[in-house]
Amino acid sequence: GLGDSLSYLAMSNGDSDIASIHRYRIIIPFLADLVRDAIRPLISSDQLHTIDALSFYLVNYLITSLAGLFLYLFLIELKFKPERSLMGVFIFLGSRITILSTGAPMVDSLYYLAIIVIVYFCLTQRSMLLCLLTPLLILTKETTVPFLFLPLLLKTINRKLILLSLSVSFAILFWVRSLVTATVPNVSKSEHPILVTITSHLSSGLDSLSQSYFSLAGWHDLFSPFSVFWVIALFGAWIEIKKIDTYYEIPRFLFWIIPFAFGFAVLSSNSGRMLHSLFPLVIPYALIAIDYIMSRKQLKD
């Protein structure tokens, strides 16, 4: 939302005295600050007022592009043909939520990149890469944390290594949070723990629950991540359940994303952005349905 964007813009300009729920999502504002310094000489004086928004856009554009690349590799690993995998990337990139998180001064693009990186490395059983990346991924956004436990559900992953990495990562998380808090004047010690963020979201989420799920605007928000592809994905899931097409097999660990996404949707005042985290599950099922429809059409022809 607008409040989120204003907070991140302030952070990129060195102001940490903002809402605690935004204060610790430091990576993208930090990168936007670096980009702003790099491109400032290239911007004419009459356009300098746009430099903050442009800096965020360039950072988010790169991150979203990386998310699209990892999504393509993820879909290839699920045995989709290159053209179908590319279609899945276009579904992701064409989503209203992806466009908003890329074009606005937001940090959600890094959240979606973190999700697809985690599930891709889980699928390809890259224990060491997961171990090395977890300390960085945990700093992206609080909502990334549950996804970091997904590798523990897989017997083929080195769980001891992942547990060690998680232990180090949480130590780094709270250390970084304490450093950020130390830069904020007149902040109480009880204000910055991660539980404050959860409590704040829970309070606002429950207050807006009826508006989110029992109003026209709320249904629009729920529909916005994947629009018609929600329905197509449900058809794809039905195809798998009925074993009409057994060529594709969606890994079971991905279904844990469902409670994560819907749980965060309840906590958040913007359920669309939270439900968009289902894209590693929704897009493959949508592609299964599309592949089935296209193959049936070819048989008729």
Model-derived regions, located:
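Membrane-lumen/periplasm interface segments of specific transmembrane helices
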Residues: 158-243, 252
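Extracytoplasmic catalytic/substrate-binding loops of multi-pass membrane glycan-assembly enzymes
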Residues: 1-10, 19-35, 187, 202
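Membrane-embedded glycan-lipid processing machinery
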Residues: 20, 24, 55-62, 91, ...
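Transmembrane-helix signature of polytopic, membrane-embedded enzymes
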Residues: 68-94
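Membrane-interface alpha helices of multi-pass inner-membrane proteins
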Residues: 116-121, 128-141, 146-153, 262
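Transmembrane alpha-helices of multi-pass, membrane-embedded glycan-processing enzymes
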Residues: 28, 32, 36, 55-70, ...
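Specific aromatic-rich, kink-prone transmembrane helix
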Residues: 70, 110-130, 281-285
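Perimembrane helix-loop-helix junctions
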Residues: 124, 146-169
